């Protein structure tokens, strides 16, 4: 079993986006700590299965970030379950989770499942619109969400999601200083190695996503920038 607490760099692949076999191989053989499969829309059991089978040709750990209960399938190493803490809709905080547990609770392997406390900070992002996230928040608000995830709910992961835009480095630094046991994931807007390295100074895990589809070479350079290997 892999230890997620040591992961510094992960790639996130959207099953609803096209990625060539050649580029997938580059991602999986890049030295990244893991590949997360997940997206905000268009996620189906068919494209999740296609992605799973493709990634399983390689040794890299593989995680499904669950956004649709209907797209869950066995075969991943871990399952990340996001709870959008700044959503205005209870369904994205605990609602869909409750429904999933009613249906699948008896057969779930709890050693494979990790809850993520999400704080979505880009109002233009699909995930913000889907979950009706309250993005016009102050630093004090974000710190409070971090404390909620870390100290009250005792979640293993607190995820700052800027999704498509590069985040506030000082805020990331201050959030990290608040966390005692939760790991800080940062995702959003990383388009080059310099940005990845900058965020890696504060976040425990840097998530690289969109740049994979825009500039594969730049995406690959983020691995060494974060891990320093």
Swiss-Prot record:
Catalytic activity field:
sn-glycerol 1-phosphate + all-trans-heptaprenyl diphosphate = 3-heptaprenyl-sn-glycero-1-phosphate + diphosphate
Q: Which positions in this protein are listed as binding Mg(2+)?
A: 14, 40
Keyword set includes Magnesium: yes
Please give a single GO biological process term from the UniProt record. glycerophospholipid biosynthetic process
Q: Give the matching Gene3D superfamilies.
A: FMN-linked oxidoreductases
Classification via SUPFAM superfamilies:
FMN-linked oxidoreductases (SSF51395)
Q: Which UniProt keywords apply?
A: Lipid biosynthesis, Lipid metabolism, Magnesium, Metal-binding, Phospholipid biosynthesis, Phospholipid metabolism, Transferase
Q: Which residues hold sn-glycerol 1-phosphate?
A: 12, 159-164, 189, 209-210
Give the EC number(s) under which this enzyme is classified. 2.5.1.n9
Q: In which pathway does it act?
A: Membrane lipid metabolism; glycerophospholipid metabolism
Q: Organism's domain of life?
A: Bacteria
PANTHER family for the chain: HEPTAPRENYLGLYCERYL PHOSPHATE SYNTHASE, PTHR40029
Describe the subunit structure.
Homodimer.
Quote the protein name from its UniProt record: Heptaprenylglyceryl phosphate synthase
Species annotation: Bacillus thuringiensis (strain Al Hakam)
């Amino acid at each position: 079993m892999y230890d997620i607490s040591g992961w510094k760099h992960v790639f996130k692949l959207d099953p609803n986006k096209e990625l060539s076999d050649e580029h997938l191989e580059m991602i999986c053989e890049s030295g990244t700590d893991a590949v997360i499969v997940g997206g905000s829309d268009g996620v189906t059991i068919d494209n999740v299965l296609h992605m799973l089978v493709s990634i399983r040709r390689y040794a890299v750990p593989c995680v499904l970030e669950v956004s649709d209960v209907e797209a869950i399938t066995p075969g991943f190493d871990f399952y990340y379950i996001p709870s959008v803490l700044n959503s205005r809709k209870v369904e994205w905080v605990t609602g869909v989770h409750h429904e999933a547990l009613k249906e699948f609770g008896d057969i779930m392997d709890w050693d494979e499942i990790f809850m993520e406390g999400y704080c979505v900070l880009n109002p233009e992002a699909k995930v913000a619109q889907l979950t009706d996230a309250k993005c016009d928040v102050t630093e004090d608000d974000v710190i409070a969400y971090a404390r909620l995830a870390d100290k009250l709910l005792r979640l293993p992961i607190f995820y700052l999601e800027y999704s498509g835009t590069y985040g506030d480095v000082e805020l990331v630094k201050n959030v990290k200083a608040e966390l005692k046991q939760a790991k800080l994931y940062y995702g959003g807007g990383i388009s080059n190695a310099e940005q990845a390295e900058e965020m890696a100074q504060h976040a425990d895990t840097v998530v690289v996503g969109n740049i994979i589809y825009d500039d594969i070479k730049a995406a690959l350079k983020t691995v060494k920038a974060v891990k320093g290997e």
